[in-house]
């Protein structure tokens, strides 16, 4: 196609990660005749933050992440954030259930597997906190099956690798949620994109969006270059979604929308220790989250995770922070400096002057040797040997910097930016990220297609039966939806070797072990 020719399309999706993949499938289910064009700078889908090696794959549902349940005055536990994140995850889970039932996702076991989610603490004060957390969460229907465990024998039965060589004179405790999942968002993204592509979506891999220009009729001119040949082309789109991970902010800045002004981004790299040693993976089958180091940011919460990637079990421990000015793992060192604009300079400088804790944390992380990292792992698994573990570089996270007063504030979460006229939207931020892709994209659709969204609601409620309802307020509906999803997603049988769990093992005898 020559530069003079302009291809028209109803929707342009920038980036082939979980956000664009989810939006493409939702649009195709609701408006099968709309034309969609997906543009991805790399040669394959989900190769950046959605790739399983580049994210934690936790299926963030706030079952185990302690930063979602902060302790308040007098030892009270605030569960507001945990309930909100879990409600969002339930929406995603319902969409995946519908997608499996209706042929959108053909290979369920390739993207989701059952794995317990566990909170772990040591030390008397932290044990008190975890008991209080359990007491606060378990009355809520979304967390009703959580267990509290402080018995050393039960700890060792559930988590034998973590029990090896542990000095149990220091008290330990667990919040154990049997109903957790491990999610390969790379596989999930590729299946969703495959479904939409088979139904007419144009995919441009190895192509990069260089500019976005608003047209007089309200549409967008999208300038694209083929990264292999240098050939240029233009697309005209009625709606543009920028789901380009760390690359979203620069593109929204180029679009010049008012809503992006004042926003900045701060890139933080991630690193993991990983092992595929079958002896170790057989003896640790859970995602176990600990307490963040004192003064460290929420993204630093350490966890020892079972991962299932391409059918093989792995253990990952981290994250350890790295630093690069790149906004993408395969980005450019100029990403950060080029993102500083007159309209966000105050925000960026404000964060630089106030986030000393983050700066101190990053410097400390950068000074760690590989031996230091394994020593950190030994807080979880005292018997860990250096020779079993290798360092793996994960993806880049770009934390949102938002204008506040005359300065700025660093936010740990995801933010949807949408133009007032609904012609363009984008997603900024990181955790909880991928697990909340469905509610995030429903938010985009409601804000950008307000007139059509009302007409879509009957179909959307078929896809997400609880849409508009808080399941934590409707225990009967939650049980029905949960049981159906568990069956369809094949999550009703624990993986081989996982223990049977009851409702509270605090004073129970050890149960038997499932081997099937």
Curated annotation (Swiss-Prot):
The GO molecular function terms of this record are: 2-hydroxyglutarate dehydrogenase activity; L-malate dehydrogenase (quinone) activity
Instruction: Please list the reactions this protein catalyses.
Output: (S)-malate + a quinone = a quinol + oxaloacetate
Annotated signal peptide: none
Which Pfam families does the UniProt entry name for this protein? Answer: Mqo (PF06039)
One of its GO biological process terms is: tricarboxylic acid cycle
Keyword Transmembrane recorded: no
Its UniProt pathway annotation is: Carbohydrate metabolism; tricarboxylic acid cycle; oxaloacetate from (S)-malate (quinone route): step 1/1
Enzyme class label: oxidoreductase
Alphabetized, the UniProt keywords read: FAD, Flavoprotein, Oxidoreductase, Tricarboxylic acid cycle
Required co-factor(s) are: FAD
Q: What is its EC number?
A: 1.1.5.4
Similarity remark:
Belongs to the MQO family.
What protein name applies here? Probable malate:quinone oxidoreductase
Species this chain originates from: Mycobacterium sp. (strain KMS)
């Amino acid at each position: 196609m020559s530069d003079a020719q302009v291809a028209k399309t109803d929707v342009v999706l920038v980036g082939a990660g979980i956000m664009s993949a989810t939006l493409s499938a939702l649009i195709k289910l609701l408006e099968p005749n709309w034309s969609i064009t997906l543009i991805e700078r790399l040669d394959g889908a989900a190769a950046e933050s959605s790739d399983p090696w580049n994210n934690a794959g936790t299926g963030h549902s706030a079952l185990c992440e302690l930063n979602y349940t902060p302790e308040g005055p007098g030892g009270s536990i605030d569960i507001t954030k945990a309930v909100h994140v879990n409600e969002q995850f339930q929406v995603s889970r319902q969409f995946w259930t519908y997608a499996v039932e209706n042929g959108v996702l053909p290979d369920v076991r390739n993207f989701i597997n059952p794995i317990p989610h566990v909170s772990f603490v040591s030390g008397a004060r932290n044990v008190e906190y975890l008991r209080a957390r359990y007491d606060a969460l378990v009355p809520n229907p979304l967390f009703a099956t959580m267990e509290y465990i402080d018995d050393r024998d039960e700890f060792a039965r559930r988590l034998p690798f973590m029990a090896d060589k542990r000095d149990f004179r220091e008290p330990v405790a667990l919040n154990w949620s049997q109903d957790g999942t491990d999610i390969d968002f790379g596989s999930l993204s590729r299946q969703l994109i495959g479904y939409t592509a088979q139904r007419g979506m144009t995919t441009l891999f190895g192509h990069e969006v260089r500019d976005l220009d608003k047209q007089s009729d309200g549409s967008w001119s999208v300038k694209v270059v083929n990264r292999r040949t240098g050939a240029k082309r233009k697309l005209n789109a009625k709606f543009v979604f920028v789901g380009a991970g760390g690359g979203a902010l620069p593109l929204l800045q180029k679009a010049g929308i008012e809503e992006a002004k004042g926003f900045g981004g701060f890139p933080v790299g991630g690193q993991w220790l990983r092992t595929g040693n079958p002896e170790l993976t057989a003896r640790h089958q859970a995602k176990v989250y600990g307490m963040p180091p004192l003064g460290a940011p929420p993204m630093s919460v350490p966890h020892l995770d079972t991962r299932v990637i391409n059918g093989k079990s792995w253990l990952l421990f981290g994250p350890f922070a790295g630093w690069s000015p790149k906004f993408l793992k395969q980005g450019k060192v100029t990403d950060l400096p080029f993102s500083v604009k007159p309209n966000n300079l105050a925000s960026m400088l404000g964060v630089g002057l106030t986030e000393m804790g983050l700066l101190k944390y990053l410097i400390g992380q950068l000074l760690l040797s590989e031996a230091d990292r394994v020593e950190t792992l030994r807080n979880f698994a005292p018997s860990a040997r250096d020779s079993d573990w290798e360092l793996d570089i994960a993806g880049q996270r770009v934390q949102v910097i938002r204008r506040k007063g005359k300065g700025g504030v660093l936010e740990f979460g995801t933010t949807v930016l949408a133009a007032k006229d609904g012609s363009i939207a984008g997603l900024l931020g990181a955790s909880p990220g991928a697990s909340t892709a469905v509610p995030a994209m429903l938010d985009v659709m409601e804000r950008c297609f307000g007139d059509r969204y009302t007409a879509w609601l009957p179909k959307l409620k078929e896809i997400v039966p609880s849409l508009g309802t808080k399941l934590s307020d409707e225990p009967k509906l939650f049980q029905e939806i949960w049981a159906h999803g568990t069956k369809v997603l094949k999550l009703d049988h624990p993986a081989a070797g996982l223990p049977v769990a009851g409702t509270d093992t605090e004073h129970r005898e050890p149960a038997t072990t499932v081997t099937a």
